[in-house]
Curated annotation (Swiss-Prot):
Name of the protein this chain belongs to: RING-H2 finger protein ATL46
GO CC, any one term: membrane
Domain of life of the organism encoding this protein: Eukaryota
Lineage: Eukaryota, Viridiplantae, Streptophyta, Embryophyta, Tracheophyta
Pathway(s) the chain acts in: Protein modification; protein ubiquitination
Keyword presence, ATP-binding: no
SUPFAM superfamilies: RING/U-box
Description of its domains: The RING-type zinc finger domain mediates binding to an E2 ubiquitin-conjugating enzyme.
Residues spanning the membrane: 45-65
Length: 376
C-alpha cells in the first residue's frame, strides 16, 4: 500500500516524505547463531572427577581388606579355644584381670613383688586393743582385697611403707597391674627408687589416711610414724564393720561368725555399698622377722625354710552377717588352683640356698645387720 502511494506521489512530482529504506538480504551481515544448550565438559574437570573416583575405589577396597583381616584372627582364636579349652579359660581370666585393673598404672616388676616380706598370720605378735599378748587371733581381721577373714595358716605379704598386709595371692595379683597399696593408695617406694635394686627408706616415712565418717564427710586420721625395731615390722590390719544407724550418725557393729568353706572355695562375700566400711584397728601388731627369713642375711636354721615353703591352707573363713550380706561367685578369678598357688608361693618365698650377694639390699635387712654388729 505504501509502495502504491509512493508511486502516485512520484508521478505528481511531489514527495511528501522520502521513500522507505530496504535492506538488501545479500549485503546484510549474518545474524549470530543461537546459543547451544549443551556445553562440553572441560577436560580438566573430567580428569579431576576420574582421579577422585579412583581414590574412593581404592579406599573402599582397603577398608574391606582391613575388616577382613581383623575378623579372621578372632575366628581363628575361637576355633583354637574349642580345641584347647584350658588355654581359652586362661585367656579369659587374663582378659578379666586386664579389664578390672585397666588403669594408666602398668604395675610392678615381679622381682620387686618377690622382695616384699611374707609371713604367716599366726606369727603376728600383739593385741588388737593395744595391750600385750601374743597372737592376733584374739580379734579376727579381714583381707581388704578378697573380703575374706584371715586364718592362722594363711600367708600374708606385707607392704612395709604403709604396714598394710594382704593375702599373698591377692596382693600379688593387684601389684601386677598397680604400683600402689590397694587400701591407702600409698606408693610402695620413695623418690629415686630403682626397680632393679629395690631400696626402702623407713627413716622419714609418714602415713596419711583419710577415713569416711558415718555422715559421709571425711576426716584426716592421726599421722603415725613407722619405726623399724629389732627384727620387727609393724602390721596394720582391719575388718569390715556394718553401720546400722548411718543416718543418725551412730554406728553399730554386727557380730559376724566365721565358718570354714571347704566345699565351695569360690564363694565370696559382697557387701552393700554405704553400709559397710573397712576400719583399721587401733592395734600394735608386729611381725618378727628372723635372720633366716630375710633374703639379705645368711640362713641359720633349715627348719624355718621348711616352714616358710610349706603350702598354705586353701580353706578360707567366710564371715556371715545376719542381713545385708550375700554370697557371690563374681570374683572366682581371684582364687587360684591348689597346685598353682603352692607352686607360686614356693617360687616367691626366699630360699636359703640363694647367694647373699646376689639379692637386693632392703632396709629392714640392713637394720638387722647393724643391730648384730652393735650386739657383738
Amino acid at each position: 500500500m505504501s509502495w502504491v502511494r509512493f508511486t502516485i506521489e512520484q508521478k505528481d512530482g511531489n514527495f511528501a516524505y522520502p521513500p522507505p529504506f530496504y535492506k538488501d538480504p545479500i549485503l546484510s551481515p549474518p545474524s549470530p547463531p543461537p546459543p547451544s544448550s549443551g556445553n562440553r565438559i572441560s577436560p580438566a574437570v573430567l580428569f579431576v572427577i576420574v582421579i577422585l573416583a579412583v581414590l574412593f575405589f581404592i579406599s573402599g577396597l582397603l577398608h574391606l581388606l582391613v575388616r577382613f583381616l581383623i575378623k579372621h584372627p578372632s575366628a581363628t582364636a575361637s576355633s583354637r579355644s574349642n580345641r584347647f579349652p584350658e588355654i581359652s579359660t586362661s585367656d579369659a581370666l587374663q582378659r578379666q584381670l586386664q579389664q578390672l585393673f585397666h588403669l594408666n598404672d602398668s604395675g610392678l616388676d615381679q622381682a620387686f613383688i618377690d622382695a616384699l616380706p611374707v609371713f604367716h598370720y599366726k606369727e603376728i605378735v600383739g593385741s588388737a586393743g593395744g595391750g600385750g599378748g601374743n597372737g592376733a587371733a584374739q580379734e579376727p581381721f579381714d583381707c581388704a582385697v578378697c573380703l575374706c577373714e584371715f586364718s592362722e595358716k594363711d600367708k600374708l605379704r606385707l607392704l612395709p611403707m604403709c604396714s598394710h598386709a594382704f593375702h599373698l595371692n591377692c596382693i600379688d595379683t593387684w601389684l601386677q597391674s598397680n604400683s600402689t597399696c590397694p587400701l591407702c593408695r600409698g606408693t610402695l617406694f620413695s623418690p629415686g627408687f630403682s626397680m632393679e635394686n629395690p631400696m626402702f627408706d623407713f627413716d622419714d616415712i609418714r602415713e596419711d589416711e583419710e577415713g569416711v565418717t558415718e555422715n559421709g564427710s571425711q576426716k584426716t586420721m592421726e599421722i603415725q610414724e613407722i619405726v623399724v625395731e629389732k627384727g620387727v615390722l609393724p602390721v596394720r590390719l582391719g575388718k569390715f564393720k556394718r553401720l546400722d544407724n548411718v543416718g543418725n550418725g551412730q554406728g553399730q557393729d554386727v557380730v559376724a561368725g566365721g565358718e570354714t568353706s571347704s566345699s565351695n572355695l569360690d564363694a565370696r562375700r559382697c557387701f552393700s555399698m554405704g553400709s559397710y566400711q573397712y576400719i583399721l584397728g587401733n592395734s600394735e601388731l608386729k611381725v618378727p622377722f628372723a635372720n633366716d627369713r630375710l633374703p639379705r642375711l645368711k640362713p641359720q636354721d633349715k627348719e624355718s625354710e621348711q616352714t616358710g615353703n610349706s603350702s598354705s591352707e586353701d580353706n578360707k573363713k567366710i564371715n556371715t552377717v545376719a542381713k545385708g550380706e550375700s554370697f557371690s561367685v563374681s570374683k572366682i578369678w581371684l582364687w587360684p588352683k591348689k597346685d598353682k598357688f603352692s607352686s607360686d608361693a614356693q617360687r616367691r618365698l626366699p630360699s636359703s640356698s640363694l647367694n647373699v650377694d646376689d639379692l637386693p639390699k632392703l632396709p629392714w635387712m640392713e637394720e638387722h645387720k647393724k643391730l648384730e654388729n652393735d650386739g657383738r
